[in-house]
Design a protein with these regions (language model features):
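Extracytoplasmic gate region of multi-pass secondary transporters
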Residues: 23-24, 216-258
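Helix-breaking motifs and short loop linkers at transmembrane-helix boundaries and internal kinks
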Residues: 35, 67, 88-90, 247
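Residue-level signature of mid-helix packing/kink "hotspots" within the transmembrane helices
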Residues: 49-53, 57, 138, 264-265, ...
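Conserved MFS/SLC helix-loop-helix module at the cytosolic interface between two early adjacent transmembrane helices
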Residues: 56-79, 83-84
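C-terminal ends and interior cores of transmembrane alpha-helices
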Residues: 78-90, 291-298
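Cytoplasmic helix-loop-helix junction between adjacent transmembrane helices
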Residues: 100-130
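Symmetry-related core transmembrane helices of the 12-TM Major Facilitator Superfamily/SLC fold
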Residues: 158-174
């Protein structure tokens, strides 16, 4: 049962990643259909991010009250509804409104599952969990590319992904008893575990000030801010850059944009093994070196 729940959590993170790179992949086509400037994709992305931030800040309190399973199921359902709304949106401003529930749902899933896995599973599962996100993120543009290539338009690309989210919502609802059983097993274990994790059901919610008071938290937040800026910029603008800057066919550009997510997925899968040999600072330096190499190659292609 424990392995079954872990499989459900992995699938949930695949689902979380599915729509993340789709906006960037589809925007060269969407902007024409909606009569919106290319730069306006940033407004949708920022609205989604704002919803994610709000949801993540409330996640700890909501998870302690309702449980990670219920929070995840409701969040995925909210995301599914928002994505279906994307598929029928008549104009740009409706997309902005729908980006709010989309961001709230995505943030709820992300924070709840990260917290749950950190508490109930070994640390290596965190690397695999985020690799699952990468699988979803690289699959999304291919789904959108398929819809565009078949002449169905970007709306059907979003519709396909919303259907997958609905299926996952049903899976999560049926799996709710597994979440409870896992929590009961964790609660019943000996209190003197090596990781020293406190019972998640008895602690009080940790506010923003409490989090910032943790040693190293501020530095980690700054570092993660920089990482997210890099990740979101590449996912949002890679397809537009190739289609508008390099003259690549829009359908091909949508599919090629997923190569960035393939790199993320492979990197996260490999990191689970590399951490057995290298410490955290070495892993961070290795990642920065690879990023710098990629940026240099990008400028090399411009020069060519």
């Amino acid at each position: 049962m424990v392995n079954l729940l872990l499989a459900v959590i992995y699938v949930a993170f695949i689902s979380l990643g599915l729509p993340d790179a789709v906006l960037g992949a589809a925007w060269p086509t969407m902007s024409v259909d909606l009569g919106a400037p290319i730069s306006w994709a940033g407004g949708i992305s920022m609205t989604i991010s704002a919803g994610t931030i709000v949801s993540a800040l409330l996640s700890d309190r909501m998870t302690l009250r309702f449980g990670a399973g219920k929070v995840t199921a409701v969040s995925v359902a909210l995301t599914a509804l928002a994505l279906f709304g994307f598929s029928v949106a008549p104009n740009y401003w409706v997309l902005i409104l729908l980006a709010i529930p989309y961001g709230l749902g995505a943030g709820g899933v992300d924070a709840a599952l990260n917290n749950y896995v950190a508490i109930h599973y070994e640390s290596r599962h965190m690397s695999w969990l985020h690799a699952m996100w990468g699988i979803g993120a690289l699959t999304g543009p291919y789904i959108m590319g398929f819809a565009l290539g078949a002449g169905q338009g970007w709306s059907w690309g979003y519709r396909y992904i919303s259907i997958l989210q609905v299926v996952l919502t049903a899976i999560l609802i049926f799996s709710l008893p597994l979440w409870k059983k896992r929590s009961e097993v964790k609660t019943g274990e000996v209190s003197g575990e090596s990781d020293g994790t406190a019972n998640d059901e008895t602690r009080k919610p940790l506010g923003v000030r409490g989090v910032l008071a943790i040693r190293g938290a501020k530095e980690i937040l700054v570092m993660f801010f920089c990482y997210c800026a890099l990740e979101q910029t590449a996912m949002l603008w890679a397809s537009s850059y190739m289609a508008l800057g390099k003259g690549i066919d829009k359908t091909t550009a949508a599919m090629w944009a997923s190569l960035f997510c393939i790199g993320i997925t492979v990197g996260r899968l490999a990191s689970g093994f590399l951490t057995m040999k290298f410490n955290d600072p070495a892993m961070i330096r290795l990642g920065q070196a690879l990023v710098l190499t990629g940026i240099c190659l990008l400028y090399t292609s411009d020069a060519a």
